[in-house]
């Protein structure tokens, strides 16, 4: 089992964790249908940037 040789300070621990924060997903509203979707993704209706790109 691995055992540390020297104790890491709170400062060094927190500096390491400074990049671990989570961000919320960027959500957009479609111009045509008003539906929310992920950026650069087609909506569930098949719209992308106000145009119908997938026929269902």
From Swiss-Prot:
Q: What is the protein name given in its UniProt record?
A: Large ribosomal subunit protein bL32
In its UniProt record, which GO terms are filed under biological process?
translation
The record's listing under InterPro entries reads: Ribosomal_bL32, Ribosomal_bL32_bact, Ribosomal_zn-bd
Query: Mind telling me which Pfam families this protein's record contains?
Result: Ribosomal_L32p
Which gene is this protein's source?
Answer: rpmF
GO CC aspect terms: cytosolic large ribosomal subunit
* Basic residues composition-biased segments: 7-16
Region of interest (Disordered), residue spans: 1-37
Membership in a protein family: Belongs to the bacterial ribosomal protein bL32 family.
MF term (GO), any? structural constituent of ribosome
Cite the entry's keywords alphabetically: Ribonucleoprotein, Ribosomal protein
């Amino acid at each position: 089992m691995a055992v540390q040789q020297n104790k890491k300070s709170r400062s060094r621990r927190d500096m390491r964790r400074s990049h671990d924060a989570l961000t919320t997903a960027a959500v957009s509203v479609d111009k045509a249908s008003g539906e929310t979707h992920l950026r650069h993704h087609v909506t569930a209706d098949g719209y992308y940037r106000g145009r119908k790109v997938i026929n269902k």
